[in-house]
Amino acid sequence: MFYTENYDVIVIGGGHAGTEAALATARMKLKTLLLTHNIDTLGQMSCNPAIGGIGKGHLVKEIDAMGGLMATAADKAGIQFRTLNSSKGPAVRATRAQADRVLYRQVVRIALENQPNLDIFQQEVTDIILEKDSIAGVETKMGLKFRAKSVVLTAGTFLAGKIHIGLENYAGGRAGDPASVNLAKKLRDLNLRVNRLKTGTPPRIDARTINFDILAKQYGDEKLPVFSFMGSVEQHPEQIPCYITHTNDQTHDVIRKNLDRSPMYTGVIEGIGPRYCPSIEDKVIRFSDRNSHQIYLEPEGLTSNEVYPNGISTSLPFDVQMKIVNSMKGLEKARIVKPGYAIEYDYFDPRDLKPTLETKAISGLFFAGQINGTTGYEEAAAQGLLAGINAGLFVQEKESWFPRRDQAYIGVLVDDLCTVGTKEPYRVFTSRAEYRLLLREDNADIRLTSIARELGLIDDIRWARFNQKMENIELERQRLRSIWLHPRSEYLNEANEILKSPLVREVNGEDLLRRPEINYQILTALTPFKPAMEDKEAVEQVEIAIKYQGYIEHQQEEIERQKRHENTAIPANFDYKNISGLSNEVCAKLEQYRPISIGQASRISGITPAAISILLVNLKKQGMLKRGE
């Protein structure tokens, strides 16, 4: 039965990827339908109640710079904010927020329900409708069929999801939600490579049964950060502390004695888990020399008694989970309200995707989130945004867009996935980016907001504020460059009091700011450089741009060298087998990965610089050497 209404874009799934995808296409003024199995779980934080962190915070800022929701939701739901690596350079500083699950979900739902051009419908999707090799719509469990020109699939851990607690297991998408079994079967019939991954979550503990008095407190920063470039500290709810406990020899003994009841160590679970978020079983076995692991007790909200013990993700049986919890300081009498579990689920090899996140096999079908082999809310949201943008551009028959590696962490993420693929849950780190100094949290808007405006993602209010900031940066730099101090200046003594070495030549404000002992606040306290600018975001950009100018210019020169052939396109039907000089191994890899550009080909493991040179020569010979923009 076809539903009478047709859509431009249909988004399947209401998690972090799905919500960003749906909001993006709706902001592009396209008629969008978001299908979810449960409207009440839109924006659900299924695992840890936190947003951001190293690399992840950078993604959140980039999503916000392009008009996405995640940063605003975190600002309005964050109950503890911290700036990680605050003593280090600006490239690796990262914002993290402990979030109230209920508040976060409320912010997401309000945004979705008030977004023009967006309809929400509660129904499980059981099939996709194809016409030849193109998407045409979807079918739901009750037989409703919705037509659309493009579809974004963001099924999370629901595709053939299987939950494990001890040696018992059952079908489920997450605790309390059914798995998407029929859709998983249908998708396995497509020309896409499918495999299994695993993730896990710890038991939740009743706060009323924890002895907080004997535990160390961890407070957020006194100077509270914000995620959104449009956000303010006033948006934050009440701030509360987390607490710290530790595993001990007793904890580890309990785990070792019960490994024969672990689905991971008895071969029941075959999917590979996240390397950077291992289960407590894994930590005890892999780091056998350690007799203790730090565990953070994170409140799940201002109105909830549930506490998330970050660091003891487990799939051991419930009775063992109780012993693990009760073995730790402050938790001797603690009660579990939700057991921990592991979940196995289907994911698709992301090498079968274009960098736009459109599947190579089916025109108009886009994948985003954990089904592409990633882990984390932020990685999912970033993919959802990108998939939504490109689904919208596809419908409008416009040229697709995706960021370069030197342009955004979103670009690093999709390039890693689509070029190299992954066999374990992938997460973003700053160490994955070659040009970290250019991809800072603080300049995400400078990198991406103009592009987002062209794509139709940015409203007039945000655009005006962004332009005002850019103008403030330029005016302040001009002002500092125009003010000079010389050895005969009447302000010389005032300046020399704060300088490590006295002035012996004429300098301007930018020259002074480059000195390590001078920051913007100190500089603008000097009489000739008063008054300081009030726009704190612009001040930060001025100071970083001046202090790191040499390093930034060096990275930009390196990027220009790399870009010479980065975007040189390789035709989709290019015949590698007829190129003399390429080894069989190189040919096989190029045939398997089907890179869309020379840059992407160069990042495939085993593809040598010599092979790239041969490719370029042959592209030129065949008249195909067209450099992308």
Curated annotation (Swiss-Prot):
The entry's NAD(+)-binding residues are 273-287
On the tree of life, the source organism's domain of life is Bacteria
Where in or outside the cell it occurs: the entry states: Cytoplasm
Write down the PROSITE patterns for this protein, in alphabetical order.
GIDA_1, GIDA_2
Biological process terms from the Gene Ontology for this record are: tRNA methylation; tRNA wobble uridine modification
UniProt xrefs under Pfam families: GIDA, GIDA_C_1st, SAM_GIDA_C
Keywords per UniProt = Cytoplasm, FAD, Flavoprotein, NAD, tRNA processing
The protein's GO terms of the molecular function aspect are:
flavin adenine dinucleotide binding
- tRNA processing as a keyword? yes
Which SUPFAM superfamilies does its entry note?
A: FAD/NAD(P)-binding domain
Please list the cofactors this protein needs. FAD
Which residues does FAD bind?
A: 13-18, 125, 180, 370
> GO terms for CC?
cytosol
Q: What does this protein do?
A: NAD-binding protein involved in the addition of a carboxymethylaminomethyl (cmnm) group at the wobble position (U34) of certain tRNAs, forming tRNA-cmnm(5)s(2)U34.
Task: Spell out the subunit comment.
Answer: Homodimer. Heterotetramer of two MnmE and two MnmG subunits.
Name of this chain's protein: tRNA uridine 5-carboxymethylaminomethyl modification enzyme MnmG
> Which lineage?
Bacteria, Pseudomonadati, Pseudomonadota, Gammaproteobacteria, Pasteurellales
